[in-house]
Amino acid sequence: MKNFMTEDFLLTTETAKRLYHEYAADQPIYDYHCHLSPQEIAENRRFTDLGEIWLEGDHYKWRAMRTAGIEERLVTGNASFKEKYQAWAKTVPQCIGNPIYHWTHLELRRPFGITDVLFSPKTADAIWDQCNEMLQQPEFSARGIMQQMKVKMVGTTDDPADSLEHHKFIANDNSFDIAVTPSWRPDRAFKVDHVGFKDYLNKLGKAADINITRFSDLIAALAQRLEVFDAHGCRSADHGIEIMRFANEPSETDLDAILTKRINEQALTELEIAQFSSAVQAWLGKQYAKKGWVMQLHIGARRNNSSRMFKLIGGDSGFDSMDDRAFAEPLSGFLNTLDQSDELPKTILYCLNPMHNEMLATMAGNFQGGGVAGKVQFGSGWWFNDQLDGMQRQLTSVAQMGLLSQFVGMLTDSRSFLSYTRHEYFRRLLCEMIGGWVERGEAPADMALLGEMVKGICAGNAKKYFGF
């Protein structure tokens, strides 16, 4: 029997231990996709207590608490963070087998240095006092935690209409050496069927100083904002796609007619929705290619399943799940449209349902070339898949159907400043997997070769791929 979460946590072979401790552990973090608030980084937010920094916006924890029978008042309601923290302490011992149990204890270890203590109602008060005292120190501010965790850059998630004022402030602050770059998230500009699309056109038009009444106006507004993002260091776009649609682009007259119908709040056909979203995204993809940006496609989340809870507390609150619809055909059509004119940017494909893993891994192989290593990639296990089984399945698919050596590695996709330990979680699993290959004679015991591969996957590949 092994002790829980030692320094060799998840590492069962000597090769795995060497790969992790000698090559992976000290690599910097390039967190190229996250949902951190740039304002909180700019203002160097200080957190009052452990409940606030742990529970304020973490829908993973919220889902677990609800499943454990915690009432909503103690999850997202008006209870104090001390009360919510106590409810969380009751929940965590029930989470064994869920990655949250590992994440919780990793987050206590780093950055707080709390080891050899299991989080529970019995230990919660002492941990509360110890962590709260540390949170008052400069190294436990938002920026301080990032520096402790050896973060080199983060890519936040930003709407085309955002001012980027906080990114500008951070870039001009010579006292902070971590790059905080915006990432272009244009979902509201191409999801013509969504509630609020008309209002969003007004918001985008105001940001670009363009009155959007025709398709060409929308493109002009997006083009103007693309330049602003590029000037602020943007290197990546991210499209959140619940339903992957594709249709051949119609005439601009037809696109104008679709836009006019939507502005007049008339219903659109499924074909019109596909035509409009495809046209906008195809135009965007070509712009990314010109600028050298990376295009990330997150596909297959089924959002806001509980309409009752959506009305009560809004989206991104723990009521999303995997969809199971097929999307190989429309995805292929979309990528091929860009590739036909050699205007496909570097692209990372993510699926929420792991039934699509092998499809995406092989789809990526269709569109390599141009002298770019790993130009199109099957991205890291996303959301419900950033746990041991999910990450191993994703890594195995990449290794068997692509080149694991070119993989750009892990990202947090998180709203929490304590989530950087997910990079450690990923790195340990990666080294365990490769170490297992060596122990079974499936890979050579060449530590220099494997060590460089591990270093690349942990940090170097992302740095090169995104141009950081």
From Swiss-Prot:
SUPFAM superfamilies hit by this protein: Metallo-dependent hydrolases (SSF51556)
Catalyzed reaction equations: D-glucuronate = D-fructuronate; aldehydo-D-galacturonate = keto-D-tagaturonate
Gene Ontology MF annotations: glucuronate isomerase activity
Associated pathway: Carbohydrate metabolism; pentose and glucuronate interconversion
Entries under Pfam families matching the protein: UxaC
Signal recorded as keyword: no
Xref: NCBIfam families: PRK02925.1 (NF002794)
Protein name: Uronate isomerase
UniProt source species: Marinomonas sp. (strain MWYL1)
Gene: uxaC
